[in-house]
Design a protein with these regions (language model features):
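Conserved small-residue packing positions in alpha-helical repeats and bundles
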Residues: 57-58, 86-89
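Short coil/turn linking the two alpha-helices of tandem helical-hairpin repeats
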Residues: 91-93
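TPR repeat positional signature
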Residues: 53, 82-85
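N-terminal alpha-helical interaction modules that lie
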Residues: 1-75, 104, 108-181
Length: 181
């Protein structure tokens, strides 16, 4: 999916949307990305996006610029804003606060595709113990991330990071895609 030249240039600073983000902690991955995202005008970059603020939050979060991501998500009352807000707190890590925001999300349109992607990751890494059920459960994934971050370098951490990348890609695409698509 293409989101325009500005977004492509920014995402190109870190693996074109395929970066594995840390499950917790860390600092902003790219000061240049932070600057370029901050300098771009939301109405220009995501003019016809389904959820422009959500797309902006997703860009900041992709580069682990959590303060900026949190600020934008906090001002976005949509389900997508709550979803990004939940991810910010999951990565903080603050599982209770993340759960609060996921309760505000409810059932999101990306959940079926996210479950499918997570199942593929689980099939490739069965010892990772992702504990998937018949529907995507963001609360269970918070627990997976909590366990995984306490096992640095483990198969579980790698699998959780891969699922988190899939989640980011799906949610960013959902937000940044043109509203009429």
């Amino acid at each position: 999916m293409t989101y325009g030249a500005t977004v492509a240039e920014i995402l190109a600073l870190a693996n074109n949307g395929a970066r594995l983000m840390p499950l917790a902690g860390g600092v902003c991955y790219s000061e240049e990305a932070r600057r370029r995202i901050g300098d771009s005008k939301l109405e220009d970059v995501f003019a016809s996006a389904r959820a422009p603020q959500g797309a902006l939050t997703g860009q900041y979060l992709y580069f682990s610029c959590r303060d900026e991501a949190h600020e934008v998500a906090q001002s976005d009352g949509s389900a997508e804003g709550s979803y990004w807000h939940a991810i910010v707190h999951r990565q903080e890590p603050d599982p209770g606060n993340s759960s609060y925001w996921f309760r505000r999300v409810g059932k999101h349109a990306i959940f079926p595709a996210l479950l499918e992607g997570a199942r593929a990751v689980e099939a490739a890494s069965p010892s990772a113990k992702l504990d998937l059920s018949g529907v995507w459960d963001p609360f269970a994934f918070i627990e997976v991330c909590e366990r995984a971050r306490r096992q640095p370098g483990s198969e579980m951490e790698a699998a959780a990071m891969e699922v988190q990348r899939i989640e980011w890609q799906l949610l960013f695409d959902y937000c940044a895609r043109r509203s009429r698509d």
